[in-house]
Amino acid sequence: MRKDRLLHLCLVLLLILLSASDSNSTEPQYMVLVPSLLHTEAPKKGCVLLSHLNETVTVSASLESGRENRSLFTDLVAEKDLFHCVSFTLPRISASSEVAFLSIQIKGPTQDFRKRNTVLVLNTQSLVFVQTDKPMYKPGQTVRFRVVSVDENFRPRNELIPLIYLENPRRNRIAQWQSLKLEAGINQLSFPLSSEPIQGSYRVVVQTESGGRIQHPFTVEEFVLPKFEVKVQVPKIISIMDEKVNITVCGEYTYGKPVPGLATVSLCRKLSRVLNCDKQEVCEEFSQQLNSNGCITQQVHTKMLQITNTGFEMKLRVEARIREEGTDLEVTANRISEITNIVSKLKFVKVDSHFRQGIPFFAQVLLVDGKGVPIPNKLFFISVNDANYYSNATTNEQGLAQFSINTTSISVNKLFVRVFTVHPNLCFHYSWVAEDHQGAQHTANRVFSLSGSYIHLEPVAGTLPCGHTETITAHYTLNRQAMGELSELSFHYLIMAKGVIVRSGTHTLPVESGDMKGSFALSFPVESDVAPIARMFIFAILPDGEVVGDSEKFEIENCLANKVDLSFSPAQSPPASHAHLQVAAAPQSLCALRAVDQSVLLMKPEAELSVSSVYNLLTVKDLTNFPDNVDQQEEEQGHCPRPFFIHNGAIYVPLSSNEADIYSFLKGMGLKVFTNSKIRKPKSCSVIPSVSAGAVGQGYYGAGLGVVERPYVPQLGTYNVIPLNNEQSSGPVPETVRSYFPETWIWELVAVNSSGVAEVGVTVPDTITEWKAGAFCLSEDAGLGISSTASLRAFQPFFVELTMPYSVIRGEVFTLKATVLNYLPKCIRVSVQLKASPAFLASQNTKGEESYCICGNERQTLSWTVTPKTLGNVNFSVSAEAMQSLELCGNEVVEVPEIKRKDTVIKTLLVEAEGIEQEKTFSSMTCASGANVSEQLSLKLPSNVVKESARASFSVLGDILGSAMQNIQNLLQMPYGCGEQNMVLFAPNIYVLNYLNETQQLTQEIKAKAVGYLITGYQRQLNYKHQDGSYSTFGERYGRNQGNTWLTAFVLKTFAQARSYIFIDEAHITQSLTWLSQMQKDNGCFRSSGSLLNNAIKGGVEDEATLSAYVTIALLEIPLPVTNPIVRNALFCLESAWNVAKEGTHGSHVYTKALLAYAFSLLGKQNQNREILNSLDKEAVKEDNLVHWERPQRPKAPVGHLYQTQAPSAEVEMTSYVLLAYLTAQPAPTSGDLTSATNIVKWIMKQQNAQGGFSSTQDTVVALHALSRYGAATFTRTEKTAQVTVQDSQTFSTNFQVDNNNLLLLQQISLPELPGEYVITVTGERCVYLQTSMKYNILPEKEDSPFALKVQTVPQTCDGHKAHTSFQISLTISYTGNRPASNMVIVDVKMVSGFIPLKPTVKMLERSSSVSRTEVSNNHVLIYVEQVTNQTLSFSFMVLQDIPVGDLKPAIVKVYDYYETDESVVAEYIAPCSTDTEHGNV
């Protein structure tokens, strides 16, 4: 070791003797700085420094990519010294990115400097974000959202968005928009959810021009908005030194008032490991009544929580539940407190990243406790390079201390600084958590300089706030000899942010005699262009070409140039009053406003659009180092001529590769440098004897270490809080009637005027809550701006709430409760009135008083016993009015509010008749040809009709689809809960749109309505899709169902036809077609898969030929060409089937023949079509110019009815297929075809129900399809009219006229007499469509039925208080009819008045293999049973009392065959305590 040191010293002496003194050089110096990452289509800068020029030169920059060479800039420079930055813009490139060569040339008469280096060129990517109007939606609501695009400077981009789509939780695409042009950088879209969407997480997906994919999630679920919020205040951090912890729990209504009730709080520490079997988690629980402020506060001793014991999580889990007084509504909130054993913690808040010999090394530390609270006046220790020498310092009142290290005599290359308060304790106890005193450490490398000249930018602590000018201190030490003959030295600086040079400048320093030490200040405005991170580089070139410089990083507040302010005026306003939303932004900004009920945000907090979230979209926030594929610099390839360097007679021997140099500063900022100056430290290529540890230590012992005595001013961010304007208020309104309760209130785009202001007049909704509003604005000049949240509290000093049941049966008695709440600070005297009505009788239960005294934050509840007298919807109007009174409330004087002295709430009660509702419909198509046509209408009622329940109406329409168009989403008075039934909500819209298009009657209003139904129906149908592309009646629920061939074909053709009107994902069509092709057998027929719910058509559909005919029809209606292989093969199957069918007996295969006739017609096989139609004509039922077809095995019609029953579903369906076969005859139907079709249509129209549908789903779909084809084939525009007169035998008579102007208008009148005899007369010269609908209730009677039904309650009698409020409904059913099994059966259980089903117990029924689905709809429970046989099925579920009702009437349970609705049975049940005279149910 000693020998090596002697050899090293000898070598150094030899080099000194051989070295020659270097002379100062005044050669021209060049430096060009360009970012290594360049974005296209946006201005970029490169900075040029020329020094000591002695001739005019041309500076040029060019970019070479592929075969293209593009000039970026050219500058002619005549000045001796020049520093400036030049702007240039790159055009968009074909690829998203490419590596290019940047060439710099500086050329003059004697100068020719050339450098070439790589840079990465990227196409500019827009920053796209999505905002929804709220974070969660209920089924059936409309999702509204905005798509916004800005560039990297946050200015709006009017780009073309190639694709936007919505995905449901199964990742099915349910909507899409293509080639959407953004205007002013924004576009607003909306999408209606179906009434039964898949619940879960949805997402909006945006694909940008550059190929980027942005996703924004939202949730769809059924929910009830919370009335109040539970706020839990616990310390974020609990120290093991704490003896007590304060827990505060408050309940606050969304309108800001305290909640009365009981709070229960539990505090738990869970075990940290499951293996701790010898311990149990520690929990404490307490309950208290909330005080008048809606809060409780409790001190908990930490010993009870064992916070110093090991084996538990270092967390305290707090759960608080508040049960609201009066309603027992519970809301829960959870919080977690971290438990820390950190007693003190030191951290560097401001420290030099490197050190420079001769410039003090500065550092600032902050001492905090485990909760982050500063510890003042505390002594701590400072150690340098782990030496045995320590210094110390004391923190100030803010817990801060600043110190410096004198670096003059430091000769090593690394500085290791450690600060600590307590020496580490190596002892450890397994049962107790030990105190932890954390120190901090920092390593700084030395900066290399040949001359010992340095410049240093002092770091700044914290984040710099926008809107002020920041001053940066630059310290320097300069070797006078290195200055040569300079009289002044120019320091140049530039600032980079987001990877772009944004600022530049120069500071000139006079050169003094002798070595120079000192500092100067640089300042720059802190604005959005330097956020979020600014990097400053300062440098100067000495005469010999050495570059001295430094770089520093500054954290900048995320801010935007467009300052947006949003405020409500007034900030508190009563419901239904007028308010103003004021927006201030950069002039001509377009502002997007949103205001949401705070309850929505309480239920589903969302990641709000904020300045931070927008900054997170930036592709480059801070450019550090070079991109991987351009990390090559020409200078890096230089050779190393010798292992030492001589400068001014001194020898420099590199000791470490960790030293920093100018090149490392530039590279750290991502800057490419083109220069002939000295920016690198010398390279060490040979092994140099290392310096001993002792030598390193001595270097630091000589360092002076001391505390800098200067005050510290923390640099904290400041925000301007603009108070809401409370000067304006709405005028006095004597009374409010509240009925408008939205979840999203404001969703608008508003343009700001040239003064930068916009004011929007709004009407406050009726919800008593707090509305949270936000806005973002877009300006071409100022870019994007985002407001802070503005609030409006919708509130009135007192209001009334009503409690009543959803429905009652006439004769029942219920209690109507009205609660008046007073939130005025003073007492008021209130008069509460229930508006009288002939529709009900009411008597007040409490002692009748003219007015009631209600003091501040108190409530008064009044009740009435109500007996409804009329049927239908009955309105109850309750008003609470503050009265003038000289009478005292207690000891207080009564006050009257200045505004909103009266509050009125109107709620509707459905009063139903006793018994079971029946509906009879009489429909006909009547054509007058100049002569009068009369019909007799005899309306009779059965003997068991319920008094006053009968009502009838008469309707006239001029269009064959008029009735269906009026009720397109309500064609059947039946549930739609399966995949087939949903299609009756979907398919008819297509037929209506096609028909109105063909007849040129389609209006925008009708189109918008039908398209909306298609969109929601499409969503619903996807619920029944299988992964393989098939569909089944109830979807892939519980893995019980296979894909259904028939339903898949039905959905496939309907989706394909809907493509003309709405977006349908092609993947759904392709997958279904593929699945069906796999079902095709070698003989061309299709294999049956899955189960059908309608046995009436199973005989045909399960037969290969019938199913194959149906599937072929579906494929042809897509339409697939006849030449398609699947269709061509199917034709072989159908031809074989017809050859078999025509050999059958009379009446057999009627359904199959009807399908084959239509299929051959679509295939263009007219010979087969005619052959089949002739065969069917022989089997037709013809009567009174009406034609239809029946099944041979048709069930017998019930006897003893007043009216002929509606035709079964299967017969309407097969008759409609025959009609389609006539109408699709090619090349066109003959006059004979149309005559036959007219007689068929007349029969079909007579089967139509009051809503325009038929008896079930498939007959409705096929019949409306056929009627639409008939209507289009026979439609003619004529000026002729028709008159319709309806009159009775007395004085009633009404006339209607039908002409071209009112073809689609539903003309309707109520008929006065029931029972009654009416005469209908039609005159004129056109066809009209007449319909009479009669409804009445009958009392249940024992009848023969193919179903056996038994219903009972558990308990059966009123055997205790619990039976008043809850009981179980149990029922059994079986099928006793002529068939082996029923079709799908609906069990419809109506609730007893005042009771509601317990939904979880209903849902559990779906676990049964016989139950396919359950629904809770209003006051009914629906159970879908796939089929019922002679085996008894049992079901049961619980019901709970919601509202007390007295004199309870029995409720009805109805079981019916969905496809043969005449097959039904009805039974009654009664609540156990409905006849309890002692307690009653009230």
Swiss-Prot record:
Spans annotated as Bait region: 685-735
Q: In which tissues is it expressed?
A: Plasma. Prominent constituent of late-pregnancy sera.
Q: What is its main location?
A: secreted
Q: Which Gene3D superfamilies match?
A: 1.50.10.20, 2.20.130.20, 2.60.120.1540, 2.60.40.1930, 2.60.40.1940, Alpha-macroglobulin, receptor-binding domain (2.60.40.690), Immunoglobulins (2.60.40.10)
Enumerate the Gene Ontology biological process terms. female pregnancy
Q: Which GO terms describe its cellular component?
A: blood microparticle; extracellular exosome; extracellular region; extracellular space
Q: Which Pfam families match?
A: A2M (PF00207), A2M_BRD (PF07703), A2M_recep (PF07677), MG2 (PF01835), MG3 (PF17791), MG4 (PF17789), TED_complement (PF07678)
Top-level taxon of origin: Eukaryota
Provide this UniProt record's keywords sorted from A to Z: Bait region, Disulfide bond, Glycoprotein, Protease inhibitor, Secreted, Serine protease inhibitor, Signal, Thioester bond
User: Which PANTHER family does this one have?
Assistant: MACROGLOBULIN / COMPLEMENT, PREGNANCY ZONE PROTEIN
Similarity section: Belongs to the protease inhibitor I39 (alpha-2-macroglobulin) family.
Q: What is this protein called?
A: Pregnancy zone protein
Name of the gene encoding the protein in the UniProt record? PZP
